[in-house]
Regions:
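AMP-binding/adenylate-forming catalytic core of the ANL superfamily
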Residues: 87, 104, 352, 357-358, ...
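ANL superfamily adenylate-forming
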Residues: 109-154
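Conserved AMP-binding A3 loop
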Residues: 30-32, 158-182
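Conserved AMP-binding/adenylation subdomain of ANL enzymes
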Residues: 181-198, 206-245, 259-261
C-alpha cells in the first residue's frame, strides 16, 4: 500500500543496523531501532483512535522520539502539527482550538496547564518528555512492532505548520505528501546529499527548517545525523570534525565566528554549510569564508512553500543573495499586477509542487494569497539581477512610505550595519504628523563601542538620500526576535509607536 512520505523517508530504514542518529551524550540509535520506534508509536496512535486525516499536535522537546512521532503520524495517514515548545498554555489554546487535533502530545511536566486546554477542544492529552518517557511511550511499548502504513496519495495532507511570522495571528499552512517530498528530492539533488553524509542537526524540529528541510533531506538520502537538542557551542564544535554538512540560522554562524576554536582544521571534514530562516549579513558570509575557507550557501523559503531558491552548490554563491529559483519552481517579481524590470523591486510570487494547499480554516486568506492559477503571493520584496540571482530586500508589510516615497528598510540597514559602534540595526516606519510615516532606526550597540549618533548621522547623510535617512534613532542591547531569529518588527513598531506624535 503506498504512503508516499513514509515509503520515501522511513520504510527504507527497516533492517539497517547502521547508526542513524548520534546523540549529544555519545549514544547512537540505529536506523532499524528508529523505524521500529516509528512503527510502535504509529500503533499507539491508532490505539488512541487516530484515523486518516486527523491531526496529531506535538509540543515536545527535540528528541529521537519526537522525530519518530512525525514518522508515526505520517504512517497512520494523519496530519502532523508541530508546535513551538516556547508557547504557553494560553497560546497553545489558539492552535488546539483552530486545528482540533485528535491527540495532543506534550511534555508531562506541563500536563496540569495543558489538560484544561485539551479538554476544552476535545483533544486527548498524551505525554512525551525530552528523555523519551511519558504516557505515549508507555502505550507504544505495549504495541506489536509490526505495523502496516495506511494508504495515502500524494495530494493528501501530511502536515499543518503554523507560520512563525512576525505579524498577526499564526496561520496553519496545509502541506501535502507531494509538497514535502518534491522539495526534499530537489534539495537532496541540488545540495549533493548521499548516504555518506553526516548532517550536523542543531535546529528545532517544530519549524520547516529543522523538520522538513534538514530531517527530510537526510532521511530521504539515507545519511546520518548528529542530532543535538539545540545549538550548544561546545557540542557543535565537538560534532563539526565528524560531520559533513551543517544547516543553521545566521545566529549559529555568528556564534561560531565568536569562538576561536572555529578554524580551517576544525571544518576540514565539512563539505557544506547552509543558512536560512533569517537574512545572513554579507559581513558574516565574508568573515566565515575568511576564517574557514568555506562559503556559506544561503537559500530562501517559507512555511507555506518550504524552499524556493538556493545559491548553487557548484558555482558562485553570492553574499547577500538567496540564489536562483529551484528546479521546478517558477518565481516572478510583481508590482501593480505586472512583472518588474531587472534590478527593480517587486513582490515575490512562486508556483510549483512545493506550494502549499492553503491555510487551514481560512478560505478568505487562502484566496487572498494563493491565486487560482497556483501562484502564491509571498509578501517578500526582492530584486533579480542579470544572472537571475534573487536578493530579498524586506517584507511588503515593512515597507516605509514617507511623504509618498518608498523606503526599503534593508537598504538603510545595510548602511547602518557598517558603521562603528553598530552591531546590527532594524529600520521601521512610525506614524508621523507631517510625512504619514517617518523612518526610524533601532541600533544594537557593539560589544566594544557605543554608537556615536552624530557620526552616524553624518555617514548616513553622505550615503543616502534625505527621504531615506532616519528621522530619529534608539540604541538598545538587542533586538526582539522570534524563535528562528527573525527580527520582530511589529513588536518594535508597537514599542516606539508614539515617538513622533505631536
Amino acid at each position: 500500500m503506498p504512503n508516499p512520505l513514509f515509503d520515501a523517508l522511513f520504510a527504507p530504514l527497516a533492517g539497517q543496523d547502521r547508526p542513524l542518529l548520534h546523540l549529544a551524550g555519545g549514544q547512537q540509535l540505529t536506523a532499524a531501532a528508529f523505524v521500529a520506534l516509528v512503527e510502535r508509536l504509529a500503533a499507539a496512535l491508532q490505539a488512541l483512535g487516530v484515523a486518516p486525516g486527523d491531526r496529531v499536535a506535538a509540543q515536545v522537546a527535540k528528541s529521537p522520539e519526537a522525530l519518530a512521532l512525525y514518522g508515526a503520524t505520517v504512517a497512520v495517514g494523519a496530519v502532523f502539527l508541530p508546535l513551538n515548545t516556547g508557547y504557553t498554555a494560553a497560546e497553545v489554546d489558539y492552535f488546539v482550538g483552530n486545528a482540533t487535533p485528535r491527540v495532543f502530545v506534550g511534555d508531562p511536566a506541563d500536563a496540569a496547564a495543558l489538560a484544561p486546554v485539551c479538554a476544552a477542544h476535545g483533544a486527548q492529552l498524551m505525554g512525551l518528555s525530552a528523555q523519551g518517557t511519558g504516557s505515549l511511550l508507555d502505550l507504544a511499548a505495549q504495541q506489536d512492532a509490526a505495523f502496516a502504513p495506511v494508504d495515502r496519495t500524494g495530494g493528501d495532507l501530511a502536515a499543518i505548520l503554523y507560520t512563525s511570522g512576525t505579524t498577526g495571528r499564526s496561520k496553519g499552512a496545509m502541506l501535502s505528501h507531494d509538497n514535502l517530498l518534491s522539495n526534499a528530492r530537489v534539495l537532496a539533488d541540488l545540495w549533493r546529499f548521499t548516504p555518506e553524509d553526516v548532517l550536523l542537526h542543531a535546529l528545532p524540529i517544530f519549524h520547516t527548517h529543522g523538520l522538513f528541510v534538514a530531517s527530510n533531506v537526510s532521511l530521504l538520502t539515507g545519511g546520518q545525523m548528529a542530532f543535538l537538542p539545540g545549538f550548544d557551542l561546545d557540542a557543535v564544535q565537538a560534532a563539526l570534525p565528524k560531520s559533513t554538512v551543517m544547516m543553521g540560522v545566521p545566529t549559529f554562524y555568528t556564534r561560531l565566528l565568536d569562538d576561536p576554536r572555529l578554524t580551517r582544521d576544525r571544518v576540514g571534514h565539512m563539505r557544506l554549510f547552509i543558512s536560512g530562516s533569517a537574512p545572513l549579513l554579507s559581513e558574516t558570509h565574508i568573515a566565515f569564508e575568511a576564517r574557514t575557507g568555506m562559503r556559506i550557501l544561503e537559500r530562501y523559503g517559507m512555511t507555506e512553500t518550504n524552499m524556493n531558491t538556493s545559491n548553487p552548490y557548484e558555482g558562485d554563491r553570492r553574499a547577500g543573495t538567496v540564489g536562483l529559483p529551484l528546479p521546478g519552481v517558477d518565481l516572478r517579481l510583481m508590482a501593480d499586477g505586472l512583472p518588474v524590470a531587472e534590478g527593480e523591486v517587486g513582490v515575490i510570487e512562486v508556483r510549483g509542487p512545493n506550494v502549499f494547499q492553503g491555510y487551514w480554516q481560512m478560505p478568505d486568506k487562502t484566496a487572498e494569497d494563493l491565486r487560482p492559477d497556483g501562484w502564491f503571493i509571498t509578501g517578500d520584496l526582492a530584486t533579480r539581477d542579470a544572472d537571475g540571482y534573487i536578493t530579498i530586500v524586506g517584507r511588503a508589510k515593512d515597507l516605509v512610505i514617507t511623504g509618498g516615497l518608498n523606503v526599503y528598510p534593508k537598504e538603510v540597514e545595510e548602511v547602518l550595519d557598517t558603521l562603528p559602534g553598530v552591531a546590527e540595526s532594524a529600520v521601521i516606519g512610525l506614524p508621523h504628523p507631517d510625512f504619514g510615516e517617518a523612518v526610524f532606526a533601532i541600533l544594537v550597540r557593539a560589544k566594544d563601542a557605543e554608537p556615536d549618533l552624530a557620526a552616524i548621522r553624518a555617514a548616513v547623510d553622505a550615503r543616502l538620500a534625505k527621504f531615506k535617512q532616519p528621522k530619529a534613532y534608539a540604541v538598545v542591547d538587542a533586538l526582539p526576535r522570534n524563535t528562528m531569529g527573525k527580527v520582530q518588527k511589529a513588536a518594535l513598531r508597537q514599542s516606539y509607536a508614539d515617538r513622533f506624535k505631536a
